[in-house]
Amino acid sequence: MSVPRSSGAKAIAKAGQEYRDGDYESAIVTLASATVDENDYLDLAYLLGLCYTRLHRFDEALLYLEQVVTQGAGDTRTLQCRMTLAYIYSMTGRAKLAEYELTKLVESSGESPQVCSALGHASWKQGRLDEGLRWYAKALDLAPENPTALNGYGYLLACAGKDLDMALTCCRKALTEDPGNPAYADSLGWAYFKLGNLDEAGPYLRSAAEALADNEESAAHVQEFERAVRSR
């Protein structure tokens, strides 16, 4: 005889569909009104954490995601929550915490292009550029056409002033894969700038800065570019 699903389980199933439909606010409302038992709570926390992340309500997302990671069984859901925590910490300038979560992911599930790329970014943000390059190189060994890894590796090469032709090639490939990504446009513009090709650099750097209006790094690139133009 089948056991009837609890009202909490039904609410979680409904919220899951709302999440997949991109209706994150409705999913939160559905879950907020649900009464769940202990067995269903981590399912609820998991969905709430993902919904709040999608809405960039990061403080609320952390509250739930950390519960899943702490109490979870090391399953796929727990790994996803660790990756999401790393994303939030990266977005909010907490690179050391992002690195901690990513290192735990490597320990539990091994290296992947996504995790290696994220570790490259976290290392660079903490001032360890050479280590960042090594992580991005690992990501490219695993997935040579991965645009995140291509962009990160190319950008860090440009920042270091190393192998600038390779930097340009990687950044160009990344933008070709994702032409609407302003961060990739900024990286390509920066690679051109480092090569001394101001005519090519300008359109990419300016369009990226316009799209990334609150990004200090992109704005700094444009300022340095404009100083170079005035002085040539």
Which stretches of residues belong to each language-model region?
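Canonical tetratricopeptide repeat
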Residues: L47, T84, A118, G152-Y153, ...
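TPR alpha-solenoid repeat register
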Residues: L44, T78-C81, V115, A149, ...
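Residue-level detector of the short coil/turn that links helix A to helix B
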Residues: G22, H56, G93, G127, ...
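Position-specific recognition of the canonical hydrophobic site in helix A of tetratricopeptide repeat
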Residues: Y19, T53, S90, W124, ...
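Residue-level recognition of tetratricopeptide repeat
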Residues: G16, L50, Y87, H121, ...
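Short coil turns that delineate tetratricopeptide repeat
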Residues: N39, A73-T76, G110, P144, ...
